[in-house]
Amino acid sequence: MAGRNFLFVPGPTNIPDRVMRAMMVSMEDHRSPAFPALTREIMPGLKKVFRTEHGTPFVFPSSGTGCWEAAVTNTLSPGDRVLAARFGQFSHLWIDMCTRIGLDVQIVDCEWGTGVPLQQYADILKADTEHRIKAVLACHNETATGVTSDISGVREALDEAKHPALLFVDGVSSLGSIDFRFDDWGVDMAVSGSQKGLMLPAGLGILCASPKALEMRHSAQLKRAYFDLNDMINANATGYFPYTPALSLMYGLVESLHMIEEEGLDNIVARHHYLAEGVRAAVTKGWGLKLCAKEAKWYSDTVSAVMLPEGINGADVIARAFNRYNVSLGAGLSKVAGKLFRIGHLGDMNEVHLMAAISGAEMAMLDCGIKVTPGSGTAAAGEYWRHHSAPSGLIVRDTHKHSKETHGTHSLSGPAVVKG
């Protein structure tokens, strides 16, 4: 098909040209004396993205799912009780992992389209006077349903109950896109991945651990090997890794961290909200459809899950968008499979990018027999964006810029080139 594929799934996301160029490097010795310069760029940059002074970031060659496992196995023991809410496919998968590795999961089942049930969490934690619950799990942004939860409210529930449980947060599709405050929210383990707001290919699991969580590794009895933080801590102390790191992705990560710092986290968060509001205007005002998120307080600024009329299979809309218009939309998962499609609006994105998503989805819906007014989605989104001030992150900038700074023998955009 002529032209390029327009990728609007909620991860993997579009990769900026700068980041792609930064990853175009020849391989090098990851145990060379020069290698630690790369690590010294990455770890401080990640701390800024997590908004932490006290947390310790870790980078694994894995997906975000790998870091789910790392968070749990480095802090807990077989039979430990954890509190978790299930309100979407990814909150369900974390619960499933905890069950399979031998934890006692106290599950709060919620309607899909809602988020973490703060009052139920508060009641359960207050009633747990013996402190049998060792950790509380919270999915910050549930991509299956387009729902964002209030993590500060979970911390308040823990504090009001004077409960010592660890707070684990899935920030895979929120970090670097939606406001995330590791220190302010008292998070103990935060999990993310490279393929969302960090604007990289999949392949890096990102974890941030509090001092309290790191202390727990000394008593944790769950089996671990590949994800043992002791190995990472010992190797990272000298700028190295306990096994082969994903070198190309790490050079890309340096560049993406530069882009994030240049735009500014507050501006990035504002940009994602502004763009998401335009998409939501297209869905609700233009097309007259509903979002899976039940209330505005749950709306995600990185993904919108669009509910379809009865009798319409979302898979048909997604297939039509891809096969006819070369637009990739996200599918419904598990309980909502076939009932919706998802538009991802995170990472390196602007208004005109999203106009392509909206128009492609609209044409596909019309082709599948859904009665929407042609042009209504783009009109509604455009009206919102034209009449609201664009965040500074959408001011025209040099997207072809490439970092030139060097530390030691390493360029921040790739290994030093030695000319002979």
Description of each model-found segment:
Residues 55-83, 87, 91-96:
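Conserved beta-loop-alpha segment that forms the PLP phosphate-binding cup at the N-terminus of a helix
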Residues 2, 335, 339-420:
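PLP-dependent enzyme catalytic core of the Aspartate aminotransferase-like
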Residues 116-176, 189:
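Active-site phosphate-binding strand-loop segment of PLP-dependent enzymes
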Residues 290-324:
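Conserved PLP-binding catalytic core of the aspartate aminotransferase-like
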Residues 14-15, 195-282, 391:
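Active-site C-terminal subdomain of aminotransferase-like
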